[in-house]
Amino acid sequence: MAVPARKTSKTKKRMRRGHIKLATLNLAPCPNCGELRKSHVVCPSCGFYDGRQVVAVKNANN
């Protein structure tokens, strides 16, 4: 069975794992209510998407 010839150093290990991280959210203000929401997703606070009401929200501010 294959085994590593040498111990992997902390630096080498951290360099390899450098790309493993959480992606940042693309937040944009909702044009209808102004709250931050994810891009290309229905606004959870008002239910609008692309300028029209898509989802009925119970506690709409407008």
UniProtKB/Swiss-Prot annotation:
Q: Quick check: keyword Ribonucleoprotein in the entry?
A: yes
Q: Fetch the Pfam families from UniProt.
A: Ribosomal_L32p
Q: Which organism is it from?
A: Levilactobacillus brevis (strain ATCC 367 / BCRC 12310 / CIP 105137 / JCM 1170 / LMG 11437 / NCIMB 947 / NCTC 947) (Lactobacillus brevis)
* One GO biological process term: translation
Task: Tell me the protein family, please.
Answer: Belongs to the bacterial ribosomal protein bL32 family.
In its UniProt entry, what is this protein called?
Answer: Large ribosomal subunit protein bL32
Could you list this entry's UniProt keywords, alphabetically sorted: Ribonucleoprotein, Ribosomal protein
Q: What PANTHER family does its record include?
A: 50S RIBOSOMAL PROTEIN L32, LARGE RIBOSOMAL SUBUNIT PROTEIN BL32
* GO MF entries: structural constituent of ribosome
- What SUPFAM superfamilies does the database record attribute to this sequence? Zn-binding ribosomal proteins
Which cysteines share a disulfide bond?
none
- Which InterPro entries does the annotation name? Ribosomal_bL32, Ribosomal_bL32_bact, Ribosomal_zn-bd
Q: Which terms in the GO cellular component ontology are assigned? A: large ribosomal subunit
UniProt lineage? Bacteria, Bacillati, Bacillota, Bacilli, Lactobacillales
